[in-house]
Structure formats: structure tokens, C-alpha cells
Amino acid sequence: MAKAKSVFFCQNCGTKSSKWMGRCPQCGEWNTLVEEIIKGTKHSRTPSRGVGNQTAKPTALPDIEISSIARVSTTFNEIDRVLGGGIVPGALMLLGGDPGIGKSTLLLQVSQKVADTVGAVLYASGEESQLQLKLRAERLHINSERLQVIADTDLDHILEQAEAITPSLLVIDSIQTMYTGDIDAAPGSVSQVRECTSRLLRFCKERNIPTVIIGHVTKEGNIAGPRMLEHMVDVVLYFEGERSYQFRILRSIKNRFGSTSETGIFAMVEEGLQELSNPSASLLAERSDEESGSAVMIYLEGVRPILVEVQSLVVTTAFGMPRRTAIGYDLNRLIVLLAVLEKRCGFTLGNKDVYVNVIGGLKVNEPACDLSMAVAIVSNLKNRIVPTDMVILGEVGLTGNVRSIPRIEQRINEAKKLGFKKFIIPEGNYKQIKDNDSSIKIRGVKSIQEAMQLVFS
């Protein structure tokens, strides 16, 4: 038996080193090398090689026939949109997200839909027993005979079962709990994650079985394990949201078969995850029309316009240093906006505590929402109500000018569906609008001062 030895792997790029170093010599990242004890290398039952087999031969590109097999629909329109029309046969997909955000719930519901409409699905869990999976399935009202579950962490055994079943979809929950006996290291280590992912990649490509693997995330929000993991897979998805709120967003970070600009929006309810085809209506359902400090903004989630209410509260500070608090909005942008309002508009905010909140637990970082945020702040400061059928859009510069924003007509069309009639937009965008709809009123502004006069006149 080979003597055990200690090696160090970079969690970012997977580089192997015989000694610890503060900085990875390959990728240059700091404090990414972790120690692993290698007791000896066993003879691998499955050679570690690339996709395909040793008999593969090169083929001219025009001679390659495109398979007639269509994408597999999950029957969730929100998920199919993010994936570019459905699951591509033979694709290896990675789903990441914070603990408890709903990753397993989402994939269990997808497994049920695929099992009912396409064929057998194998759900392999290394985190829950079969009894625990059954209890979760009952809560979600899932009871498909074609959905088979296995509670195991031995990837080789799971792949043997998948070979026998030939499922239409394979789910691995999660890659950090899986191990192969050919690598003498703990599950979740860099070498185990890399080798297990490599074997899953070969399996799904050679047998044309789409596979989804769940990945844990670090406290920085990155997928745990080597960065190579994200490079190996075909699709990288992130499931985001605040656990204390019901809304969840499925975002594509990498997609070899479609766009990365699409997003899917869900609501977490008692029966599981429910897709929201019209999230703007849900976000504005409880908006009050009798209170100051409220405005409606339209931000782009990928290429999808979403209307959301923003609220502000401005009170006289009880301390020497005024507080600025932002929930769902960038604090630095808020501080800049307050400085612009004080310098360019003459509002006294140096002795005021300012609190802003984006309703629904969503996070908005788009500059196009600057003007609506500024209007909400002034609304509460002056105790003036913003018209309920008005939407304000525009990026605010340090000089107080209102700059153009992208996809203005797409945003306006989305707001029209919900009954909004008045729009204040940048002058540069106003000149670009081609649709002269007489049922709505659009005004273009050049400065933040002009916008305030239009809203509160």
C-alpha cells in the first residue's frame, strides 16, 4: 500500500502543490490552498479521460448530424425560459444557492413533472434518507411511480443504478456529499468534487442523459469546491432570494445552449414553489395609494422588466450622525442620491435619518431606478403623495441631470399592462419612443429638478 502523503489543492483553479502557499502560483488568488491527505492511489475502474471513448475519431463538421431529439420541457415556463427552451439531452447542469433557499424543493418538483410527461427520473440524495425524501414529497403532493429515489453517497453505485434505469433525468443532491472509492479523500474535497463531476460529465454525454447536480455555496456566495467545477458543466444556475421573503429568482450564469439574460421568478408557498408569470402584479398587489414615500420603479431582471414598489422614510435624526439604511438597494447609490438632492435641489437632508426599502425582498442595483428612488425620498420628506398611476424612470448624474436608460419601450409596455397611465422618463429616451399611444401620458425630463416639479406640481 502506498504511503500517505499531504498535498494542497487550490479551491479556485484546482492546482496541486506539495506545500502550502499563501498565494496560488497558477491563478494568483490568496488563501485558497487547502490540505488533503492522500493515502494512496487505487486502480481506477473508470479511466479519468475526457468525454467520449478511446475509439472516437475526428469527423468533419458538416458531416455531423444534428439529433432530432427535442429539448425536454420541465413544464415550468419560468425554468424553460432560463434554460433556453427546456433541458438539452446530455447536458450537465449545476444549481447553486444558499442553504434553505429551496434548491431541493425546486428539483423535486421538476423531477415530478419530467417523470409524468417524459419518463423515469432518478433522484439521488446524499443529504436525506429515503424516508425524509418521502416526507418532503408528501408535503409537495408528489407521488409519481416513475420518480425513483436513492439515498447514497457512493457515486459509482448511483451511476450503476442509473445505467440500469436509463432515466430521462438524473438529479444529484449534492455534489459535495458524493465520493468515489478510487480517490482516497473525504467527500467534498477538491479532488473528490473534481473526479465525481468528471465522471458525471462522461456518463451524461455518452448516454445522452441530462443531469442536474446541486452545489453548496460559500459565505461569499460562490459554489463550494474548485472553480473548475463551473467550467466543466454546461449550465450554471443560481437560485436566489431572502429566506424571510417568499420570492425566489432563478438566474443563469452560464448556458452553452441559450442566453444568460433570462430569469425565472417563483414564490415559495406551503405547497412548494409556484412560478410567477406576472411577478409585477404580485409585487404591487398590496401597494397603498394613500401614503407618502412610495413610488414605483421598473428594473430589468436580465431582459425582463419588473415593476416593484420602493418605500422611503425620512425622519429627523436623534443623534449627531444621521443614519442611512437601505434594504434591497445599494447603500452607496443612496448616499450619492441624497447628496445630489441636497446640492442640486436644495433639500436639507444632513439632519435627517433616511431609510429605503425595496418591497418583496428583491435586490435592485440598476441605475435606471435612481430617479424613482429620489422621488420616493422627497415624497416622504415633503409628505406629498406620488400619483398612483405614475412610473418614474431615469439614471441621475452627479450634476443632477437625468440620463437615458436601456429598453425604455419594453418597460413602458409592461407598466401599461398593469394600468399605469403617466410616465416620467429621460429626455433622451423620450425622443426615441415611436409608439404614440394616446391612452398614456409620457413626459421627458432633463434634470432631477424638472422631474420633481412634474411629480409634485
Task: Please provide the spans of the model-predicted regions.
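Divalent metal-dependent catalytic cores for phosphoryl transfer on phosphate-bearing substrates
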Residues: 130
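P-loop (Walker A) phosphate-binding loop of NTP-binding proteins
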Residues: 98, 126
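Peripheral, non-AAA+ core regions of ATP-driven protein-machinery
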Residues: 2-12, 16-81, 88-94, 101-112, ...
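Conserved RecA-like ASCE P-loop NTPase motor core of nucleic-acid helicases/translocases
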Residues: 121-125
